[in-house]
């Protein structure tokens, strides 16, 4: 394994070079910053001089404009009185028109409010009628279902009675026929068909 002394010396030299390079970079940065500040100050001074010249020119123009406006104002004072009188007349006319329109709108609002109240009362009455009609419909449907169920029960009872009578008649006929001629099926002891469905189980 090589000795570590040489590696330590190499690292120390590299770190020294880095420090020197960092110092050079910092010095260059400071120099550039100073130049930049100088340029900025020069630009600011030039800008201030330009603004001062423009402000002076604007001040002169403003003074001249004020003089012109004063002259125009003096010449328009007489016209201003007439204009003021005309505007006052128009303002009064406009106020009267606004008051008339306001009264008209108030009347329209009152009429619409009355119509709304009437519509609400009619809607409430219609809702009550609809609710009552639904109740009557439900009651009628319940009565109809009860009637249908009663009719079904009666029809089942009638049908079962008819079937019972028919079976009894068939048994009687079978008993009579057994005395005359015995079929092979009956000879083996087979019982005649019997209705086994209980009453009430038949669905129409």
Curated annotation (Swiss-Prot):
Primary subcellular site in the record, as a coarse category: cytoplasm
Biased composition annotated in UniProt, kind: Basic and acidic residues: 1-10
UniProt subunit comment: Component of the nexin-dynein regulatory complex (N-DRC).
Residue ranges of the region described as Disordered: 1-26, 175-204
Similarity field: Belongs to the DRC12 family.
Alphabetized UniProt keyword annotations: Cell projection, Cilium, Coiled coil, Cytoplasm, Cytoskeleton, Flagellum
Protein name per its UniProtKB record: Dynein regulatory complex protein 12
Keyword Thylakoid (UniProt): no
Function, as annotated: Component of the nexin-dynein regulatory complex (N-DRC), a key regulator of ciliary/flagellar motility which maintains the alignment and integrity of the distal axoneme and regulates microtubule sliding in motile axonemes.
Location in or out of the cell: Cytoplasm, Cytoskeleton, Flagellum axoneme
UniProt feature coiled coil, ranges: 45-159
Listed InterPro entries: DRC12-like
């Amino acid at each position: 394994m090589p000795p570590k002394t040489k590696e330590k010396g190499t690292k120390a030299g590299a770190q020294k070079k880095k420090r020197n390079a960092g110092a050079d970079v910092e010095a260059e940065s400071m120099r550039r910053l100073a130049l930049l500040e100088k340029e900025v100050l020069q630009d600011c001074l030039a800008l201030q001089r330009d603004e001062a010249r423009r402000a002076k020119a604007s001040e002169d123009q403003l003074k001249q404009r004020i003089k012109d406006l004063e002259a125009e104002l003096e010449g328009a004072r007489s016209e201003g009185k007439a204009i003021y009188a005309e505007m006052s007349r128009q303002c009064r006319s406009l106020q009267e028109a606004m008051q008339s329109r306001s009264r008209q709108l108030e009347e329209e609002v009152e009429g619409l409010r009355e119509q709304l109240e009437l519509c609400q009362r009619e809607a409430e009455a219609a809702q009550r009628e609809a609710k009552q009609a639904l109740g009557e419909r439900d009651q009628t449907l319940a009565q109809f279902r009860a009637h249908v169920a009663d009719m079904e029960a009666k029809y089942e009872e009638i049908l079962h009675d008819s079937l019972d009578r028919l079976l009894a008649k068939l048994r009687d006929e079978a008993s009579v026929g057994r005395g005359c001629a015995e079929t092979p099926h009956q000879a083996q002891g087979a019982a005649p068909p019997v209705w086994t469905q209980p009453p009430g189980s038949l669905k129409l």
